[in-house]
Amino acid sequence: MKSVFLFSSVLLGSSLLFFGPHSPKNTSSSARSFKRTSTSPVGTISIVIDKSDYELSVYDEKGWYATFPVVFGSNNLDDKKMEGDKKTPEGSFRIISKRVHEKWYRFLAIDYPNKESWEKFNARKKRGEIPANASIGGSIGIHGTWPREDYIIDKYKNWTLGCISMKKDHLLELYAFTPIGTSVVIRK
């Protein structure tokens, strides 16, 4: 009986070391990207970010194109409520700008806060869920990691202030084929 308990403890401890305390429910991707064999997406693309699975998926006119591992704000994957809560917002957005970034290689900004974000924010204020003087925040987007820290993505370590972070090579690929105006859905 002692050996079963010891084995279980070692197994649990090892999994926490490898995956961290907040690994995604679907770890089958092992933080690798997957994509169709075609070299680039066909026609209009859209992006779906699944916070529970730690995945950013790209769809084009043929359907699914690619999936990349990503991480978010704080370890709690709840919806963003206000500025400073380190949460990644949920909802429907668009890419509004693209630029080279001095820290994170590239930055694809989304239109947070948009009308949907403001409606949720004001409803939360009205219900007293957030302070009356809270602000909604902004400057949310998709970006890379700190230089030489792509391993953070492999370990599913949430570290941003609310943005979506991905490995440098994956980000450069996404940046190359994603136009301004692209639809981005972020869900839990």
Describe the residue ranges of each PLM region:
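Positively charged n-region of N-terminal signal peptides that target proteins for export
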Residues: M1-V4
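Bacterial Sec-dependent signal peptides at the C-terminal "C-region" and cleavage site
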Residues: L12-S29
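N-terminal post-signal-peptidase region of extra-cytosolic proteins
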Residues: A31-S46, K51-S52, F72-S97, R124-G128, ...
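Well-ordered beta-strand positions in beta-sheet-rich domains
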Residues: S46, T67-P69, S92, S139, ...
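Short Gly/aromatic-enriched secondary-structure transition segments
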Residues: G63-N75
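Exported/periplasmic cell-wall-interacting domains
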Residues: R99-K188
